[in-house]
């Protein structure tokens, strides 16, 4: 009985066609994800949220003094202090955003907290209240511009004394700069340290 011999292999696909299709897909995706999408999102952001899209820059007298999104290093007694910052070589270095990555048993973490406690007590020896934890710890980004209302309240008397201001006026200023949780549910109440310190300059 006669048998039919099958071809050893199917016809090879056209390599040039596959390469052309891959190239078209690559160029198309590059244009969409690398050009079109960023341009559209940036345009929407600038139109809907111009301040945030521009970095939430805070200005005084027409000059930028900082960003509402990035903390600054305050260590003088007449200012409210923010959280510790683990960025290097300088605190609140936006180009080196990171946490300390130190484990809870690492002596360096304990030493940093002890040093901040000592600095807080030296700046206000009469204050015997418990120190809020956010004043002796760094945030995950190292750039957190906020502290808790409790951390601000801990520093009120020191700041008022250094500026020769009534304590109640400084307390009122803290309350005015306290931001409630989003929709009253998401997050915790916070105080922006830079905005609070700028507000101190407006008190007479």
From Swiss-Prot:
Q: Where in the cell is it found?
A: Cell inner membrane
Protein name as annotated: Potassium-transporting ATPase KdpC subunit
Give the protein's function: Part of the high-affinity ATP-driven potassium transport (or Kdp) system, which catalyzes the hydrolysis of ATP coupled with the electrogenic transport of potassium into the cytoplasm. This subunit acts as a catalytic chaperone that increases the ATP-binding affinity of the ATP-hydrolyzing subunit KdpB by the formation of a transient KdpB/KdpC/ATP ternary complex.
Subunit architecture: The system is composed of three essential subunits: KdpA, KdpB and KdpC.
Q: Which UniProt keywords apply?
A: ATP-binding, Cell inner membrane, Cell membrane, Ion transport, Membrane, Nucleotide-binding, Potassium, Potassium transport, Transmembrane, Transmembrane helix, Transport
Topology of this chain in the membrane = Single-pass membrane protein
Which chain regions cross the lipid bilayer?
21-41
The family line of this record is: Belongs to the KdpC family.
One family from Pfam that matches here is: KdpC
Presence of the UniProt keyword Cell membrane in the record: yes
- Cite the GO molecular-function annotations of the record: ATP binding; P-type potassium transmembrane transporter activity
Q: Which PANTHER family match?
A: POTASSIUM-TRANSPORTING ATPASE C CHAIN (PTHR30042), POTASSIUM-TRANSPORTING ATPASE KDPC SUBUNIT (PTHR30042:SF2)
Q: Does the keyword Membrane apply?
A: yes
User: Mainly resides where?
Assistant: membrane
Question: Can you quote a single GO CC term?
Answer: plasma membrane
Q: Which NCBIfam families match?
A: kdpC (TIGR00681), PRK00315.1 (NF001454)
């Amino acid at each position: 009985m006669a048998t039919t011999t099958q071809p050893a292999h199917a016809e090879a696909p056209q390599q040039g066609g596959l390469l052309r299709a891959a190239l078209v897909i690559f160029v198309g995706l590059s244009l969409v994800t690398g050009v079109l999408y960023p341009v559209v999102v940036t345009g929407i952001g600038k139109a809907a949220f111009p301040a945030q899209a521009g970095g939430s820059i805070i200005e005084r007298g027409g000059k930028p003094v900082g960003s509402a999104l990035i903390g600054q290093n305050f260590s003088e007694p007449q200012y409210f202090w923010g959280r510790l910052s683990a960025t290097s070589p300088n605190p609140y270095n936006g180009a080196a955003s990171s946490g300390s990555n130190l484990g809870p048993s690492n002596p360096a973490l304990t030493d940093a907290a002890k040093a901040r406690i000592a600095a807080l007590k030296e700046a206000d020896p009469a204050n015997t209240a418990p120190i809020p934890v956010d004043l002796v710890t760094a945030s995950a980004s190292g750039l957190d511009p906020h502290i808790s209302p409790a951390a601000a309240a801990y520093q009120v008397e020191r700041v008022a004394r250094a500026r020769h201001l009534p304590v109640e006026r400084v307390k009122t200023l803290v309350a005015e700069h306290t931001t409630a949780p989003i929709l009253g549910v998401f997050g915790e109440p916070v105080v922006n340290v830079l905005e609070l310190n700028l507000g101190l300059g407006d008190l007479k």
